[in-house]
């Protein structure tokens, strides 16, 4: 199947109903995308599919055909990554890639309300969210 993966053309052979999460990690070696719950409840596996945040554990590989898929590796050195470090928006790190990708999808300078709504599907057991919100607002 052909797609654009992290800004580059890619062709990956995998069963169409395999989870996008598993294809990214196992076939493509992109292990920055984390599996938390495997049920679409935690947001740890969030990636961008045609610039929209999706839980990769819920998306069949076939849905990525011809699409643009962006993982945390595709952001390179995005300012949000530094902001998360500067504002201690990450502790254990399991939720961080998904949080950053969900935040990227919010666009530039989102309001606190937009951040809270945009990250509602991304759970964090460590930070209490305020540091994450500050990190996103700082960029």
Give the positions of each predicted feature.
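Signature of N-terminal electron-transfer/Fe-S-associated modules in redox systems
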Residues: 1-139
């Amino acid at each position: 199947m052909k797609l654009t993966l992290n800004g580059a053309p890619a062709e990956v052979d995998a069963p169409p109903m395999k989870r996008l999460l598993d294809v990214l990690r196992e076939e493509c070696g992109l292990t920055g995308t984390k599996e938390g719950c495997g049920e679409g409840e935690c947001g740890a596996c969030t990636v961008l599919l045609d610039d929209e945040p999706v839980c990769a554990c819920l998306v069949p590989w076939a849905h990525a055909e011809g699409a643009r898929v962006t993982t945390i590796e595709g952001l390179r050195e995005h300012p949000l990554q530094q902001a998360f470090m500067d504002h201690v928006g990450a502790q254990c790190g399991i939720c961080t890639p998904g949080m950053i990708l969900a935040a990227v999808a919010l666009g530039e300078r989102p309001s606190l309300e937009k951040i809270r709504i945009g990250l509602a599907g991304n759970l964090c057991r460590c930070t209490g969210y305020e540091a994450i919100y500050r990190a996103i607002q700082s960029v």
